[in-house]
C-alpha cells in the first residue's frame, strides 16, 4: 500500500486561506525555482490537486511548499500551489507562509526581522515584525510590476462590452474599473462576479496574448480584478479578485495590489513613496507602497511592497492514498 502523508499548517492571510506543507514534498530538479515549478507540474501535480481540491481543500484553497533556495542571496525558496495551478508568485500566500513558517520554526532567517525568498517569479525581499513568538505583520517587496496593455475589450453576457487594462504584479491581471456597463463591484454579488469572470478571462485569453517579456514561461491571463469605491476608513480602493474556476480572494490580493499600483503609476496617479491601501471584498486591508521605479524589457515598471497579517488556524496531517481512496487526487464540482 502506498500512502503519502503531508503534515500541514493551516491559516489565513487577511481572510484568505493558506496551507503550508510542512513535510512530504518531492525533490525537484532545476537550476531555478521556475524550472523546479515546471518539474513539479510535470510529475507531481497530483500533490497540488490532492491538497487543494475537495475533499481535502476547497475552491478558495491555496498553499505553499518550502524548498532550499537555488540562489545564495535567499534564505528559502517557495513553491506556490492553489486550485488553478502553481502561481509564479502569491502575495497573500507569502505573508501566510512567512508568518506560519517563522512561528513554527520552519523558516529561520539569517537576519532577524528580514529575509529574502526565492519564488518562480524571482527574488522577493521580506521584512516582518515579531512580538514574542507571533509574527504580527509581514511586508514583502515584490518583483517588478508593470502595465502590460490598456483598453482591451471583450463581450460578457449579462454585462455587454467590458474594457480592461492588463497589468503584471507577479501574475497577469485584467483590471475592470467603473465604466458604462460596470459601475462598482458593490452592485453585484460574488456569484455574479465569478460567472462574468469566467467568460471575461476566456474571451481575453482567446483574443489577446499575455507573455512576460523577460520570462516567457510566465504567460496567460489568470486573474480578473473587479474594482470599486472603498468602504473602510483609510482605504484608497476596493477590489474583488477572481482566480481559479470559482474563487474570489478574501484578502485584498498581494500580486493584484501590486498590479493595480503598477497601473495607477503608469497613469501618473501614484509615484515613488506613495501608499495605496487596498480593501478586500470582506473589508481586510493590504498596505501597498511604491518603493522605486524600474524597467522591464524597456517598459516602465515599479517595485511595489505589500504589508499584511496572517493567523494560524490549526495543524493538519493529510493522507493521500490512491489505492483505497478514489478521490485521492481531488475533484472539482463545476
Curated annotation (Swiss-Prot):
InterPro entries assigned: Pro_racemase_fam
Assembly description: Homodimer.
Source organism of the structure: Paracoccus denitrificans (strain Pd 1222)
The protein, known as: 4-hydroxyproline 2-epimerase
Annotated knockout phenotype: Cells lacking both hpbD and hypF are unable to utilize tHyp-B or t4LHyp as sole carbon source.
Matching Pfam families: Pro_racemase (PF05544)
Record-listed E.C. numbers: 5.1.1.8
One of the protein's GO biological processes: amino-acid betaine catabolic process
Reaction(s) this enzyme catalyzes, per UniProt: trans-4-hydroxy-L-proline = cis-4-hydroxy-D-proline
Record SUPFAM superfamilies: Diaminopimelate epimerase-like (SSF54506)
A molecular function (GO) term: 4-hydroxyproline epimerase activity
Residues that coordinate or bind substrate: 91-92, 223, 249, 254-255
Function: Catalyzes the epimerization of trans-4-hydroxy-L-proline (t4LHyp) to cis-4-hydroxy-D-proline (c4DHyp). Is likely involved in a degradation pathway that converts t4LHyp to alpha-ketoglutarate, which would allow P.denitrificans to grow on t4LHyp as a sole carbon source. Also seems to be involved in an alternative catabolic pathway that degrades trans-4-hydroxy-L-proline betaine (tHyp-B) to alpha-ketoglutarate; this pathway would permit the utilization of tHyp-B as a sole carbon and nitrogen source.
Catalytic residues of the enzyme: 90 (proton acceptor), 253 (proton donor)
Keyword vocabulary terms for this entry: Isomerase, Plasmid
Induction description: Is up-regulated when the bacterium is grown on t4LHyp as sole carbon source.
Family membership: Belongs to the proline racemase family.
Amino acid at each position: 500500500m502506498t500512502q503519502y502523508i503531508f503534515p500541514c499548517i493551516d491559516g489565513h492571510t487577511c481572510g484568505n486561506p493558506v496551507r503550508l506543507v510542512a513535510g512530504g514534498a518531492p525533490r525537484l530538479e532545476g537550476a531555478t525555482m521556475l524550472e523546479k515549478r515546471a518539474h513539479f507540474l510535470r510529475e507531481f501535480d497530483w500533490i497540488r490537486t490532492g491538497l487543494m481540491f475537495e475533499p481535502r481543500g476547497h475552491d478558495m484553497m491555496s498553499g505553499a511548499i518550502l524548498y532550499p533556495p537555488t540562489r545564495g542571496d535567499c534564505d528559502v525558496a517557495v513553491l506556490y500551489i492553489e486550485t488553478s495551478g502553481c502561481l509564479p508568485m502569491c502575495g497573500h500566500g507569502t505573508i501566510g507562509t512567512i508568518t506560519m513558517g517563522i512561528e513554527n520554526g520552519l523558516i529561520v532567517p539569517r537576519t532577524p526581522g528580514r529575509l529574502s525568498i526565492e519564488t518562480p517569479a524571482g527574488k522577493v525581499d521580506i521584512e516582518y515584525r515579531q512580538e514574542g513568538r507571533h509574527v504580527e505583520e509581514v511586508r514583502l517587496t515584490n518583483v517588478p510590476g508593470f502595465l502590460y496593455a490598456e483598453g482591451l475589450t471583450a463581450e460578457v453576457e449579462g454585462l455587454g462590452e467590458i474594457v480592461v487594462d492588463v497589468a503584471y504584479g507577479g501574475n497577469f491581471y485584467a483590471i475592470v474599473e467603473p465604466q458604462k456597463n460596470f459601475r462598482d463591484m458593490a452592485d453585484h454579488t460574488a456569484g455574479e462576479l465569478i460567472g462574468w469572470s469566467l467568460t471575461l478571462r476566456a474571451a481575453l485569453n482567446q483574443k489577446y496574448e499575455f507573455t512576460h517579456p523577460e520570462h516567457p514561461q510566465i504567460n496567460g491571463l489568470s486573474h480578473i480584478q473587479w474594482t470599486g469605491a472603498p468602504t473602510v476608513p483609510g482605504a484608497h480602493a476596493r477590489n474583488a479578485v477572481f482566480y481559479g474556476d470559482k474563487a474570489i480572494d478574501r484578502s485584498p490580493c498581494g500580486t493584484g495590489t501590486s498590479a493595480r499600483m503598477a497601473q495607477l503609476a503608469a497613469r501618473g496617479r501614484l509615484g515613488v513613496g506613495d501608499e495605496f491601501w487596498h480593501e478586500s471584498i470582506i473589508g481586510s486591508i493590504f498596505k501597498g507602497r511604491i518603493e522605486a521605479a524600474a524597467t522591464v524589457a524597456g517598459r516602465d515598471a515599479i517595485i511595489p511592497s505589500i504589508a499584511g497579517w496572517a493567523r494560524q488556524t490549526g495543524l493538519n496531517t493529510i493522507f493521500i492514498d490512491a489505492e483505497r481512496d478514489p478521490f485521492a487526487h481531488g475533484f472539482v464540482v463545476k
